[in-house]
């Protein structure tokens, strides 16, 4: 596939890195020559320096015969104009744009279609982050929760702790503990190394366990791996930007929410707009303020300012002063590995959420959902099976007959409204949504090929 990526920042660069090794012809456009040179030194791709919305630049990038344009520059307006130019002048078939401003996203249905601004797929990073954090609040103790098949199935990542009945026991004993609940452990990472789970695999404390189950059973399965944490009640947010304000709006109906904002004018605006959130003007690194607001009674402290260092330091202080759990928003990928699992319980990467959303639109075959896991090393995907036994490598076959790439596990199959946790004898049918986990994303091309029906396949 011939893909033009506009923007060589963290998201554009990471997307190029993901796609360049999958037999795609990638061209990256940016105004920053240094960034482009750095990418070209690392990967086999073309670069063009210039403004991504200019027709001359797009023509030089190969827009005349490009299959897809992905606009992820730092400017919403540039991304929108680029999609318009690609549509009007070059008839580019697929156009994807990252749009950050809530003012645009709020009216997305009216703004972004072929008769207005021709964007086929809109990526709204702030909304993705809010959704991600909200899922983690719904499942206290989970490191990551990803929904598939319109929320019917979830993949959860949980650290195994002493106190969970499964610790020190084989995976096969889970069926004895929960005879009426189906789940499949897709992978276990032990000391950062993947283990292919089998019934005889002993779960150890400290294991990072990836499992798939019907969404209503996630909490029950988590209770096998750790003592279930009580649902959160009191939440403190730091940062009143788009993410903080959106999160407060989403949470304030069901939780006791306090929000700290260091800009006085913004704090006053939020105090008027938010219905049940208590808004404070102040600095989250102010010990007196945290003490006055009873930080020791807070169930979850979430720092979502645009300053990584401020988020990390305020969360560390909150934890030291008694907050039960702390979560931080981290822009720099290198910081995520450094902080998560130390004093910081969970680090959220907006870039990773954006990449996952982008990949679901640029994958081949009928891939309707992608989630990048373990800092981009692993992937969970939702693919739709098409064809019949003569044209498909999966339709009409039981799972045991399907030649899956190394490190790939089918976790669940959704057929209509029915969720079926995978077993070797489950037969895949036309239209099934198949949820898979890959411990190594380098095999994603093989998975895509597996789900691409071919008139020549017999």
Swiss-Prot record:
Role noted for this protein: Part of the constitutive potassium transport systems TrkG and TrkH. May regulate the transport activity of TrkG and TrkH systems. Binds to NAD(+) and NADH. In Salmonella it is required for resistance to antimicrobial peptides.
Membrane topology recorded in Swiss-Prot or TrEMBL: Peripheral membrane protein
Boundaries of every RCK N-terminal domain copy: 1-123, 232-348
Binding site residues for NAD(+) 1: 7-11, 30, 73-74, 98
Keywords: Cell inner membrane, Cell membrane, Ion transport, Membrane, NAD, Potassium, Potassium transport, Repeat, Transport
Record-level GO BP terms: potassium ion transport
InterPro entries: K_uptake_TrkA (IPR006036), NAD(P)-bd_dom_sf (IPR036291), RCK_C (IPR006037), RCK_C_sf (IPR036721), RCK_N (IPR003148), Trk_Ktr_HKT_K-transport (IPR050721)
Entry's free-text remark on domains: The RCK N-terminal domain binds NAD and possibly other effectors. This is expected to cause a conformation change that regulates potassium transport.
Entry GO MF terms: potassium ion transmembrane transporter activity
A Pfam family this chain is assigned to: TrkA_N
Domain RCK C-terminal: 143-227, 368-453
Compartments where found: Cell inner membrane
Gene Ontology CC annotation, any one: plasma membrane
Name of the protein described by the UniProt record: Trk system potassium uptake protein TrkA
Amino-acid positions noted as binding NAD(+) 2 in the UniProt annotation, renumbered to this chain: 234-262
């Amino acid at each position: 596939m011939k893909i033009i990526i506009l923007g060589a920042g963290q998201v554009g660069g990471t997307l190029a890195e993901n796609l360049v090794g999958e037999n795609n012809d990638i061209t990256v456009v940016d105004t920053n020559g240094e960034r482009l040179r750095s990418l070209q030194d690392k990967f086999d791709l073309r670069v063009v320096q210039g403004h991504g919305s200019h027709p001359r630049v797009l023509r030089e990038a190969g827009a005349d015969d490009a299959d897809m344009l992905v606009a992820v520059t730092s400017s919403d307006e540039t991304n929108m104009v680029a999609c318009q130019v690609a549509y009007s002048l070059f008839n580019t078939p697929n156009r994807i744009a990252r749009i950050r401003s809530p003012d645009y996203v709020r009216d997305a249905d009216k703004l972004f279609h072929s008769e207005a601004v021709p964007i086929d797929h809109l990526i709204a990073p702030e909304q993705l982050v809010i959704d991600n954090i909200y899922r983690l609040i719904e499942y206290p103790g989970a490191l990551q929760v990803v929904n598939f098949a319109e929320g019917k199935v979830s993949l959860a990542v949980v650290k195994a702790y002493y106190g969970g009945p499964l610790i020190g026991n084989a995976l096969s004993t889970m069926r004895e503990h929960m005879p009426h609940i189906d789940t499949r452990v897709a992978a276990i990472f032990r000391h950062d190394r993947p283990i292919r789970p089998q019934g005889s695999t002993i779960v150890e404390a400290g294991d990072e366990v990836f499992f798939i189950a019907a969404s209503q059973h996630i909490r029950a399965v988590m209770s096998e791996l750790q003592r279930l944490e009580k649902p959160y009640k009191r939440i403190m947010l730091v940062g009143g930007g788009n993410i903080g304000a959106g999160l407060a709006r989403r949470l304030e109906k069901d939780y006791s929410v306090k929000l700290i904002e260091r800009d006085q004018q913004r704090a006053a605006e939020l105090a008027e707009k938010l219905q049940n959130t208590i808004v404070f003007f102040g600095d989250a690194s102010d010990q007196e303020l945290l003490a006055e607001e009873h930080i020791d009674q807070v169930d979850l402290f979430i720092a979502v300012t645009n300053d990584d260092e401020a988020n990390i330091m305020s969360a560390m202080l909150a934890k030291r002063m008694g907050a039960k759990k702390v979560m931080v928003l981290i822009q720099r990928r290198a910081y995520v590995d450094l902080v998560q699992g130390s004093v910081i319980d969970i680090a959220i990467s907006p870039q990773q959420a954006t990449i996952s959303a982008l990949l679901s639109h640029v994958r081949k075959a009928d891939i309707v959902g992608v989630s990048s896991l373990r800092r981009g090393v692993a992937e969970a995907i939702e693919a739709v099976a098409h064809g019949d036994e003569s044209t498909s490598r999966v339709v009409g076959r039981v799972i045991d007959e399907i030649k899956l790439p190394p490190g790939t596990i089918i976790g669940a199959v959704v057929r209509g409204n029915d969720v079926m946790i995978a077993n070797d004898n489950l037969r895949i049918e036309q239209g099934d949504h198949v949820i898979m986990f890959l411990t190594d994303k380098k095999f994603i091309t093989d998975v895509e090929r597996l789900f691409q029906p071919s008139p020549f396949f017999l």
